[in-house]
């Protein structure tokens, strides 16, 4: 019951705290192309995460489940939207259903709505190999997300305080999983060193989950009597974290998430090196405040606008979009310079 109540708290406070932190994409400018040699009608948006083929570089990221009828209804609606647009979708952490079988329906509903969809199971880094297998089976998942949420746990009144052995547990899950494993942050970004560690144990896909979207430190602080306000602005901005990711030179697939709300955000994230992008809080707010049809329409517009931007840049495919020239400036440039990451190749390609 405590876990289910927490799930509902997360929805309430995620909506009330909003997405007030900056994601850094304002520091990224495309180099205008006056002769793009492109046509809107020939633009294609297919992409891949590892060996998973996706029809769109936009997917619905992990949000909820395990909070009774309300979370079941949210996942049901999101699965409908995913089916309508042929988008991949992740569920929220399934530990609630592993601890209480009665909560499993709030996750299983996605397969009932969209039997042939691409879905990602989701567990925290405390999960065992056996729990990972059960989570995958629960939703007949095509991949498994393992989320890293140290700052959220530390801020959570009842959260974990021991994070030893996490990399070793992830390695065991990777070695034993029958589906690809995606390791994701939850809004605090990832450094290049973290991604190198993950690659060293066999992880092949990473969701950088940068600062700029839903602020889980602020969410958990709303549930505390004594706020840990020093965590509210903690983390690496989304744009910066994508560049940190690509600087590792590992054969990894990268998912950009963290405050992405517009087609321009999507285009910039991909041009920086992401293979795809993920939306969570922005989609949840539209769904809860304006309804499912408004969300369907918004995703239509995102795809239309992305193709307009790709046409303007002369990028006919997602792969070509990853190679267009851009300029990195401001705080993002300053951070990357201090971190010893050369950005000149972005502007000269």
UniProtKB/Swiss-Prot annotation:
The enzyme's E.C. designation: 5.3.3.2
Cofactor(s) needed: FMN; NADPH; Mg(2+)
Record field: catalytic activity: isopentenyl diphosphate = dimethylallyl diphosphate
Amino-acid positions noted as binding FMN in the UniProt annotation, renumbered to this chain: 62-64, 93, 122, 184, 214, 258-259, 280-281
Alphabetical UniProt keywords: Cytoplasm, Flavoprotein, FMN, Isomerase, Isoprene biosynthesis, Magnesium, Metal-binding, NADP
Family per similarity comment: Belongs to the IPP isomerase type 2 family.
Record protein name field: Isopentenyl-diphosphate delta-isomerase
Protein species of origin: Bacillus thuringiensis subsp. konkukian (strain 97-27)
Gene from which the chain derives: fni
């Amino acid at each position: 019951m405590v876990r289910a109540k927490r799930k509902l708290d997360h929805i309430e406070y995620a909506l009330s705290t909003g997405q007030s932190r900056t994601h850094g994409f304002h520091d990224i400018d495309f180099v205008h192309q006056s002769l793009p040699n492109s046509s809107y009608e020939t633009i294609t948006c297919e992409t891949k995460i590892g060996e998973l083929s996706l029809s769109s570089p936009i997917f619905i990221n992990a949000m909820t489940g395990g909070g009774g009828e309300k979370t079941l209804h949210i996942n049901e609606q999101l699965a409908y939207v995913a089916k309508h647009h042929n988008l991949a979708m992740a569920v929220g952490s399934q530990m609630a259903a592993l601890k209480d079988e009665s909560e499993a329906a709030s996750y299983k509903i996605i397969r009932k709505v969209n039997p042939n969809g691409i879905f990602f199971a989701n567990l925290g880094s405390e999960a065992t190999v056996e729990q990972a297998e059960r989570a995958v089976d629960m939703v007949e998942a095509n991949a498994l997300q393992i989320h890293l949420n140290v700052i959220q746990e530390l801020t959570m009144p009842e959260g974990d305080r021991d994070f030893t052995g996490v990399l070793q547990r992830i390695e065991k899950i990777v070695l034993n999983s029958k589906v690809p494993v995606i390791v994701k942050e939850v809004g605090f970004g990832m450094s290049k060193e973290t991604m190198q560690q993950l690659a060293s144990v066999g992880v092949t896909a990473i969701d950088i989950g940068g600062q700029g979207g839903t602020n889980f430190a602020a969410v958990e602080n709303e549930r505390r009597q004594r706020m840990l306000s020093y965590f509210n602005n903690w983390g690496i901005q989304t744009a910066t974290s994508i560049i940190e990711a690509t600087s590792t030179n590992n054969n990894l697939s990268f998912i950009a998430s963290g405050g992405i709300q517009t087609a321009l955000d999507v285009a910039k994230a991909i041009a920086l090196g992401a293979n795809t992008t993920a939306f969570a809080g922005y989609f949840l707010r539209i769904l809860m405040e304006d309804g499912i049809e408004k969300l369907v329409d918004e995703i239509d517009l995102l795809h239309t606008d992305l193709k307009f931007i790709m046409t303007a840049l002369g990028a006919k495919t997602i792969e070509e979009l990853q190679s267009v020239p851009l300029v990195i400036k401001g705080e993002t440039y300053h951070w990357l310079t201090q971190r010893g990451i050369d950005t000149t190749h972005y502007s000269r390609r």
